[in-house]
From Swiss-Prot:
Its cofactor is K(+). Catalyzes the conversion of inosine 5'-phosphate (IMP) to xanthosine 5'-phosphate (XMP), the first committed and rate-limiting step in the de novo synthesis of guanine nucleotides, and therefore plays an important role in the regulation of cell growth. The keyword NADP does not apply. This is Inosine-5'-monophosphate dehydrogenase 2. SMART domains: IMPDH (SM01240). Pfam families: IMPDH. The keyword Transmembrane does not apply. NAD(+) binds at D264, S265, S266, G314, M315, G316. One of its GO terms (cellular component) is nucleus. PANTHER family: INOSINE-5'-MONOPHOSPHATE DEHYDROGENASE (PTHR11911:SF111), INOSINE-5-MONOPHOSPHATE DEHYDROGENASE RELATED (PTHR11911). Residues 166-225 form the CBS domain.
Amino acid sequence: MSGFEDGFSAEKLFSQGYSYTYDDVIFLPHFIDFSTDAVSLSTRLSKRVPLSIPCVASPMDTVSESHMAAAMAALGGIGIVHYNCDIDTQASVIRHAKSLQVPIASDAVFKCPEHQIGSVDDFGPSSFVFVSQTGTLTPKLLGYVSKSEWSSMKDDQKEVKIYDYMKSCENKDYYVPWDIDLDKIEAVLEDKQKGFVVLEKEGETVNVVTKDDVERVKGYPKLGSGTVGADKKWMVGAAIGTRESDKERLEHLVKAGANVVVLDSSQGNSIYQLEMIKYVKNTYPELDVVGGNVVTMYQAENLIKAGVDGLRVGMGSGSICTTQEVCAVGRGQATAVYKVSTLAAQHGVPVIADGGISNSGHIVKALVLGASTVMMGSFLAGSTEAPGAYEYRNGRRVKKYRGMGSLEAMTKGSDQRYLGDTAKLKIAQGVVGAVADKGSVLKFIPYTMHAVKQGFQDLGASSLQSAHELLRDNTLRLEARTGAAQIEGGIHGLVSYEKKSF
């Protein structure tokens, strides 16, 4: 059809002076000559960190700690452990994540010895309450209380400390090696007739897995190729800031086994980050360093010249971020990803699209526009693996989710990523909220990745590399969507509906 053409090339669409979000643009379908199963989503986080799936857990204190990092690695992605804590805690989280060879985040509840169990609700969905000195999984379990035994106790027997009536965990039948696989755990539970097993490494508790956990995980999609480092353990990333004290933090994180470091800043084009990039590359040449955040080619060029191995793109696009509103700076995420990726590709630097991901379609758009991976916060928050306890609000089971620019997070130290001075006023660039229970990432991420593969198939791209080539040679065409087109492309015209993604 000479004289006619569908849509625009990406170069033309993104040169019109508009700041586009993912919802503002739509790809036009291309030709299919392969099956969905033939689509490969293998990629790179940075120059030397390969991944099987393009998913990265954001370094936020309500998203990425040990269980999330282990689960993401088991899925073929990676988690970046936040640094809104002291050095020893962050290093401990990394060591713990690398030890969770069975990446099950148990529903089990943990309490301190002096605590009481007030009601059966204290057990949550678990059949046990476990007791440790810290009231957490580590370093060692002291005992446990089963829900059935507690329910049969008299009221006056319950009005004492848990320590007074808990059962001891000294019996070695409860303990198994930390690197045992799920099938062997199930066999041990069956053989020993126990309700749970304790995974132990060098005398410390690594995880607790109950029969209920095993049954739940057996229903999840089968895991593919995990992200494993040279040490044969899960690859785990770590976030740090750009202050002088972060050099000491980095030393401890490298010793703990961090496989990649992410310089965590809302505006990465600063003298502080340039100096930190050079320090990391000179001091730890074997360690990949990801710089950012950036949204322009000018910002990206400075970090590339300094030696970054990856770029994190996004400013104010996260659901809990108010940077664009408060500071009047930022960029629509679709435009930012395309522009920065165009430059980064010329230097062989992978791009991480950070923020603005609400569904599988957004992931497809981010990847096809040039990103190698997507970094997710709210998409993973509220999952079983995310830090924090579930609570009920208006009848819905939720978990807290907060921006690292919220005042609540900044009081714990995250103001460093906003180049804040602790002696001066703190201005919030984020909010605190809650997200609904999503279940385990081990279940919903595989389904999400299959949806992404279907999107790639419709575009005629069998891999990320293929998609990037089709975009840059102008084969793939795009259009901007009007408000009415966005409404039409969503669910509309129904009195009521039930939406199930899988």
